[in-house]
Amino acid sequence: MRLDKYLKVSRIIKRRTVAKEVADKGRIKVNGILAKSSTDLKVNDQVEIRFGNKLLLVKVLEMKDSTKKEDAAGMYEIISETRVEENV
């Protein structure tokens, strides 16, 4: 499944277009490698996402084409969530 679609379906990022923008700005890594929005994700991949001053590391547990809001959190496991200083 494409990275941008997974982030939207799992509700880590609310809209696919926003997921694409974040990836295109170089703020997402998959298994430690800089990723594009079209990167193909697989179960057990680790995705690192930088949201402003927050760094989120999640492990992909499940792939679904669509899901209910209540079930979305079961698609991934949060490994770490840290605050990072902005380089000014």
Swiss-Prot record:
Domain S4 RNA-binding: from-to ranges: 1-60
GO biological process: translation
Keyword annotations from UniProtKB, A to Z: Protein biosynthesis, RNA-binding, rRNA-binding, tRNA-binding
Pfam families in the record: S4 (PF01479)
Transmembrane segments: none
CDD domains: S4
Gene Ontology MF terms in the entry: rRNA binding; tRNA binding
Description of how the protein assembles with itself and partners: Associates with stalled 50S ribosomal subunits. Binds to RqcH, 23S rRNA and the P-site tRNA. Does not require RqcH for association with 50S subunits.
HAMAP family named in the record: RqcP
Biological role stated in the UniProt entry: Key component of the ribosome quality control system (RQC), a ribosome-associated complex that mediates the extraction of incompletely synthesized nascent chains from stalled ribosomes and their subsequent degradation. RqcH recruits Ala-charged tRNA, and with RqcP directs the elongation of stalled nascent chains on 50S ribosomal subunits, leading to non-templated C-terminal alanine extensions (Ala tail). The Ala tail promotes nascent chain degradation. RqcP is associated with the translocation-like movement of the peptidyl-tRNA from the A-site into the P-site.
Family that this chain belongs to: Belongs to the RqcP family.
Name of the featured protein: RQC P-site tRNA stabilizing factor
Organism: Streptococcus pneumoniae serotype 4 (strain ATCC BAA-334 / TIGR4)
